[in-house]
A protein has these predicted regions:
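Helical hairpin unit composed of two closely spaced alpha helices linked by a short loop
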Residues: 158-160
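Active-site proximal loop and beta-alpha junction motif in alpha/beta enzyme cores
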Residues: 1-8, 13-154, 164-219
Length: 219
């Protein structure tokens, strides 16, 4: 991200779940976020499962500037030269606002060019994350994400959550779960009948260090 605080971050929650499991020896832990408490579980294969809670699905929860709109299909359209226009995305809030388009080929669209325009769409007063999703023949979902305030990212856990919710609401997949393939790798996502969204994926160490907050703050 760009260093700004966010209400929720699925990837960070998964990483913290891994760190807590390693530090405490407990496979189940609770992480408190601005968006609420999230349960994290380390599975037998080492992957981390996170219960991301229930999505916000009405216009006021997204939030949208017009709270009378149906979030299943928003009146948004963007022409893209040489490609089918992007139309009627689904809006979901997973602790942060999302806009999800389902397209024939997510790879074909210049997301780095169209992302900023859609991020700042007037229907989203708090700006939005933008996702392009393709339902593949094998049932997996290819997902590319332009993250609010950050640009194109390798992976966005809350965008994967929003996408599984949108796919189920639009009846584009069979069953509750699907593998969502982001630039950085796959996540197993499920939108359960009880309304909660479950995310399962890897979390690995990149480095370890100690942060001197006094030095950082110039004290």
């Amino acid at each position: 991200g760009n260093g700004e605080p966010v209400e929720a971050c699925g990837n960070a929650t998964r990483c913290i779940g891994r760190l807590l499991a390693d530090e405490t020896g407990k496979t189940e832990n609770i992480v408190e976020t601005v968006a609420g408490q999230l349960g994290c579980t380390q599975l037998d294969d080492g992957t981390i499962g996170v219960n991301m809670g229930e999505p916000g699905l009405n216009a006021a929860q997204i939030p949208l500037s017009d709270d009378t709109l149906d979030t299943l299909s928003l009146p948004i359209s963007l022409d893209v030269p040489g490609l089918a226009p992007l139309t009627n995305p689904t809006a979901v809030n997973m602790g942060n606002p999302h806009m999800v388009f389902f397209v024939e080929d997510a790879e074909a669209y210049p997301l780095e060019e169209i992302g900023p325009t859609l991020e700042h769409h007037p229907l989203y007063p708090e700006r939005t994350n933008v996702s392009l999703a393709t339902i593949r023949a094998d049932g997996t979902i290819r997902l590319r994400v332009f993250e609010r305030g950050a640009g194109i990212t390798q992976a966005c856990g809350t965008a994967a959550c929003a996408t599984i919710v949108a796919a189920r609401r639009r009846q584009l997949i069979e069953g509750q779960a699907a593998m969502i393939i982001l630039d950085g790798g796959p996540l197993i996502m499920a939108y359960q009948t009880d309304g909660d969204v479950l995310m399962t994926g890897p979390a690995s160490y990149a480095f370890e260090g100690v942060l001197d907050l006094d030095a950082l703050m110039g004290r």
